[in-house]
Swiss-Prot record:
It comes from Ruegeria sp. (strain TM1040) (Silicibacter sp.). This is Chaperone protein DnaK. It holds the Pfam family HSP70. Belongs to the heat shock protein 70 family. The modification Phosphothreonine is found at T197.
Amino acid sequence: MSKVIGIDLGTTNSCVAIMDGSQPRVIENAEGARTTPSIVAFTDEERLVGQPAKRQAVTNPDNTIFGVKRLIGRRFDDSDLAKDKKNLPFAVINGGNGDAWVEAKSEKYSPSQISAFILGKMKETAESYLGEEVTQAVITVPAYFNDAQRQATKDAGKIAGLEVLRIINEPTAAALAYGLDKAETQTIAVYDLGGGTFDVTILEIDDGLFEVKSTNGDTFLGGEDFDMRIVNYLADEFKKEHGVDLTKDKMALQRLKEAAEKAKIELSSSSQTEINQPFISMDPSSGQPLHLVIKLTRAKLESLVGDLIKNSMKPCAAALKDAGLSASDIDEVVLVGGMTRMPKVIEEVTKFFGKEPHKGVNPDEVVAMGAAIQAGVLQGDVKDVVLLDVTPLSLGIETLGGVFTRLIDRNTTIPTKKSQVFSTAEDNQNAVTIRVFQGEREMAADNKMLGQFNLEDIPPAPRGMPQIEVTFDIDANGIVSVSAKDKGTGKEQKITIQASGGLSDEDIEKMVKDAEDNAEADKERRELIEARNQAESLIHSTEKSIEDHGDKVDPSTIEAIELAIAALKDDLEGDKANAEKIKSGIQNVTEAAMRLGEAIYKAQAEEGGADEPSAADEDASAGPGDDDIVDAEFEDLDDNKR
């Protein structure tokens, strides 16, 4: 049975881990890094994922997609998304189904597809390490993700060729990694401030039992927002000095974003940094190049982002209230996410909870490690661990007057099932429409609509008489199913909620096929690159041999080799390059080069040079007068023995 892997699908970076014996292990990617940038880029020739995509972002801003986790499961007209769109160098479009999609190289991609490319990279990383195919995974999501976002993440896994055994909340995963070997009873708070989202979760850990008491958060608060504060500050300062608006230039905007991220990281360990971006623009009047050189202090950064940090404290207070606890009841605060390295964040968390946060976990890797532990639990490799999570938001339906009637309250332990009986609003009503919502507002329209369905053929009856039983069922992934049953006739209608505009089964199947086709194309491209490298190396070494020893060989042999090399060079040219053709050309040059070697040795033998070392022998031999390397080494050893 192949390993089940744990994946932290992050806004900024992603990470993959497995259970290695009794402990989770983070796997390094092909570039040797333990985390992979959650970036996908499209060029004329290929699709890039991770560090290669990040490296070319400045020169290809229109087609480099980042931070897609903030788009997943969201509508195009989402109010939170509106403020982000203007700061993104790539196009966010209406996917036709009302969802926010992205566009690159004139192709439309759903956020689930882009996420699938990142998950595919994580899958490849694990397969390369394990030496076997991986088909199953546990994937993490922010605790405050709604049903649509969870379903879209699960869809991404399917598109990537993974069976998603479990969707697990990121803070809960972090708690698993933190508390795996802890036997004592503890109440902990996990403060998770990542690249794009914020969560806080209160858990009780008791000898292998991990019980979530409450969770809260903001799916549009994270490091990306901190970066944009710096970007806007830099752009404003530059505009004051030079009168040029850098935010209108996509390439300059991408350079500012990279510089902002770098400066933010540097200011976690130093009090001041210099942001230096030469030739970032041009003076419109003189045509002279303009350079951006700005000093940024830690104090200035803290003033720019102070309200963002303060905003993260509101969910902390709400989570404590929902759990029925005070800050003094928390035994340990666990920090998760790269933003928790910022000194001001640590200071505010310490002030709020009244204690120094725990620093024994790696905030970038702990979530993936927790996902691997959950994978181990599902696979049976990890014993005596029980995880009880909660639903982050209340679930209910719209009733008469547009009121939101809750069936399942937030922070209810999942999986769970709840039923309630409703009736008709009019006489002789023969159908009801069940509209399902998720949220905390009193009016249904103010909450997130997850979907709707109809229960038809209700027998005519006075209003209030029919008995319609509505049942909500939330599975361990936090994904919702809803059914409605007419108790009089037994007629039932049931759906697994698919957000209006979410991907249909047909969409997913098409994307799975596209991913498989791309995987084959990627494999062919890799084979072509490897064949090209081998061919170029062979051409170089063979031409050098001709240059060094060509005078020892008859012209017809040299001519045959040069013809083979010319044919191989022709095979390497431009668009017509083909791996199989190149391999055939490599074979032809190799065979021709063998004749060169034979001719060289034959010429040496005829000249009586077989007893004398060749140039290659002189380089390798231990001294003059030795017939070959083996004898020379043997004689040296023999001398040493004496």
